[in-house]
A protein has these predicted regions:
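Bacterial N-terminal signal peptides that target proteins for export
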Residues: 1-8
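Short hydrophobic/aromatic-rich motifs at helix boundaries and adjacent loops
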Residues: 6, 65-71, 98-100
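C-terminal motif of bacterial Sec signal peptides marking the signal peptidase cleavage site
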Residues: 15-18
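Surface-exposed short loop/turn segments
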Residues: 20-45, 99, 103-131
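A structural "domain/chain start" motif
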Residues: 20-90
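Short, surface-exposed, polar/charged, turn-prone segments marking secondary-structure boundaries
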Residues: 80-85, 98-99, 124
């Protein structure tokens, strides 16, 4: 009986002591910025006298995170532990799309939906997959 108590006490002491041992240094998380690689093409013709309202890009909740997504097998998704976007991909892609549409000069103005601007057209987008 005393041997059992000694064994249990030693096991508890070792497990508590192991929690206080210095571990591996924590790896830093690398943050990436989604950027437009090509310069937006400007349109030579006159812009339509219309305003385009751009709705925030819809995406699945799993894609609304800043962590990068990867897939090791078909039908599976996971987040990288040490890599992240600087902001959620759907929000950044909406901003990049608005910049492209403004630079194209097709519309007199391109504004985000809900900005208090009266628009003639509305563009809704959805991010299906991004990994």
């Amino acid at each position: 009986m005393n041997l059992l108590r000694l064994f249990v006490g030693a096991a508890v002491a070792l497990s508590v002591a192991a929690c206080s041992l210095p571990g591996q240094p924590k790896r830093p998380v690398t943050h990436f910025i989604l950027a437009d690689a090509a310069a937006p093409a400007s349109r030579a013709g006159a812009a339509k006298p219309a305003t385009l309202l751009l709705h925030e890009m819809e995406a699945a909740p799993f894609q609304q995170d800043t962590r990068l997504i990867h897939s090791r097998a078909a039908g599976t998704r996971a987040h990288y532990q040490y890599a992240a976007w600087s902001e959620p991909a759907p929000r950044r892609l909406t901003w990049l799309l608005r910049q492209r549409l403004q630079a194209a000069g097709v519309f007199a103005a391109v504004a985000p939906l809900g900005a208090g601007v009266v628009g003639d057209y509305q563009l809704n987008t959805r991010l299906i997959d991004f990994y």
